[in-house]
């Protein structure tokens, strides 16, 4: 008999068929309590769980006593209670490699669009403000040869450094938990403490996961150390930044602009002050959102779940220590 799994995300037909070759699949729209109650028997017998964006906590795990592996269609997993998974020896799989290049493209797009005010001036054209040759009030700032500060030199940070170094001749500063020899050798990146980076960088790009240590890592004190001409980019997780402090820094001119793909609350409330600031480019968490990459992420998540339930945790496993 095939193992049973819960699928809480729509998949392309070919990937759904691949799952069905290996498992008995119960599809549900979400993991809300009423959905779990409606499909109680399926949840109680499920050995696998696959989807994205929903919260997986102790309350849900209590309804899934046979669960052996969960696979998320994402690189981030802050919506999972990892301690609760570990306590129950449930493997957690994610997709850290397939989205690297696409997310780095998005970060570079934020750098360019904020510096050159692409979104702002495009809207001015659309509403009929381009009635004569443009003047300095339409000008942006250069990107090439400006100093890029990367906070978090993981796979995405490395891919961003490659684009900045070779494409725009940008000197690279970085701060991370440890030195990154590849970044230093390939892109002449220079490791420095966070304060030094904040004071020297023209662009500060935050690419960090959300953990207890990184929550509100960036607040008023950090923005105060940045140049008044600096542009801040966040493409990691929203709660790494104290959004109230960011808004204050933007409104006061303490920093020049911000390009944001993530927020403390998502979707971003329509009354957020960020949406009324012309020096903010706000995206709806589209870092990996291309047709190609989202398909590849889903395919990776499917393969991850198949591997996990076969006891293969050599790659893409958050907590391999719980494997039996």
From Swiss-Prot:
Keywords: Cytoplasm, NAD, NADP, Oxidoreductase. The active site is at 237, 266, 285 (proton donor). Gene3D superfamilies: NAD(P)-binding Rossmann-like Domain. GO terms for molecular function: glyoxylate reductase (NADPH) activity; hydroxypyruvate reductase (NADH) activity; hydroxypyruvate reductase (NADPH) activity; NAD binding. One of its GO terms (cellular component) is plasma membrane. The keyword Oxidoreductase applies. It is found in: Cytoplasm. The keyword Zinc-finger does not apply. Belongs to the D-isomer specific 2-hydroxyacid dehydrogenase family. GhrB subfamily. Catalyzes the NADPH-dependent reduction of glyoxylate and hydroxypyruvate into glycolate and glycerate, respectively. This is Glyoxylate/hydroxypyruvate reductase B. It comes from Citrobacter koseri (strain ATCC BAA-895 / CDC 4225-83 / SGSC4696). The gene is ghrB.
